[in-house]
Amino acid sequence: MPLDLKSRIYKAQTIGNVEPIEHMIPYPNLRSLIDGQNIKYGERVVYKDYNLTSSIIYDKAQQIANWLQSKGIQPKERVLVKPMAFPFSVIIPFGIWTLGASIVIDNDDDTEKAIKKTNSKIVLRDDKIINESEKFPTHYEPRYKPLLEDEAAVLIKNSIGYQYSNYNLLVNTNGILQEIDLFSDQSLSLFPMVMVG
């Protein structure tokens, strides 16, 4: 096979900055994929305005996972998250996923109905969680490593729940990154929303 064609096939199988060798063979679960990406891109600034690197987000997510575990939340359980300010709205879901749990987002703003429909175990209402979680270790030892096919999120809109797997979110995120032309060597500036190369 000509090298050019081989390179094009390899690039076509790449999801964002996750090369096929990383998501097809050695990473059977989400945790392994994220660990690999953090080793590779940990010091890269992701959100320039907040000076947040992948490593900082990764450490905070592990603290959140430890905090959730201390609250009795188990892997595969659902956690309802109310709207929060950025960057907490990004860090907290990663903490939930680090634990191996699933996030519930209720666009209908009917908390009681969402809890009943999804059997959510806890409702996270504000960003004080970040402060509470800071006393927990930045290393989380997973008891369960979610597979790419496991549920990652439930989005409730117009009383209908839409269920997404880790793989669904990975592919959708990749599609968005390609649409806005944001690549692995760039950071995102949020004020105003522009790409920084």
Language-model-derived ranges and their functions:
Residues 1-52, 56-71, 75, 99, ...:
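N-lobe entry segment of adenylate-forming
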Residues 87-88, 110, 171, 196:
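Short alpha-helical
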Residues 80-83, 89-93, 97-126, 163, ...:
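Short beta-strand->loop structural element characteristic of the AMP-binding/adenylate-forming
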Residues 119-122, 134, 138, 169, ...:
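Conserved helix-loop-beta element of the AMP-binding
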Residues 66, 94, 174, 178:
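Short, well-ordered alpha-helices that flank and scaffold nucleotide-derived cofactor binding pockets
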Residues 82-87, 93, 151, 156-159, ...:
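Conserved AMP-binding
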